[in-house]
């Protein structure tokens, strides 16, 4: 099969024109709003969830159990959801691969839809909790907490 023995069913040439329609302005004096959650840093989330985020795939099971237990004990009162975010990364990663994982996790931890975040590490992974914490920069210490399972009694 090649271009000599195949044929297209397309005929002619279609011209495309982009004609955007202007959006009418809101009448003055009418303010727009939505029900959201303002965070201390000024960002606004549309959800108020508790996120349990592992720094390494080795603690995925623990993060699931922590989220399940929290859902059972609180009945989800006052929050939209309690969610664990498992992944298979953070251990034995190097270079750009390791940095990309850290950036994705950082962006999740700092996301305004998370009203509270528990970052869970193992303690021996490449993506160490201490170094990851430094990567967050200035963060709300009341909203974001850390746990290393190898250091917990």
Language model features: what each stretch is:
Residues 1-153:
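Metallocofactor- and cofactor-centric catalytic cores in central/energy metabolism, strongly enriched
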């Amino acid at each position: 099969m090649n271009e000599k023995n195949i044929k297209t069913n397309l005929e002619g040439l279609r011209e495309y024109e982009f004609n955007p329609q202007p959006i009418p302005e809101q009448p003055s004096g009418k303010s727009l709003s939505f029900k959201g959650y303002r965070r201390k840093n000024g960002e606004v989330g549309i959800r108020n969830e508790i996120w349990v985020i592992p720094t390494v795939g080795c603690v995925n099971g623990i993060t699931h159990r922590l989220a399940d237990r929290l859902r059972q004990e609180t009945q989800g009162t006052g929050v939209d959801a309690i969610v664990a975010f498992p992944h298979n990364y953070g251990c034995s990663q190097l270079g750009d691969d390791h940095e990309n994982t850290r950036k994705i996790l950082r962006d999740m931890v700092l996301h305004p839809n998370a009203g509270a975040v528990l970052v869970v590490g193992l303690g021996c992974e490449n993506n160490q909790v201490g170094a990851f914490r430094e990567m967050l920069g200035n963060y709300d210490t009341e909203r974001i907490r850390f746990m290393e399972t190898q250091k917990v009694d």
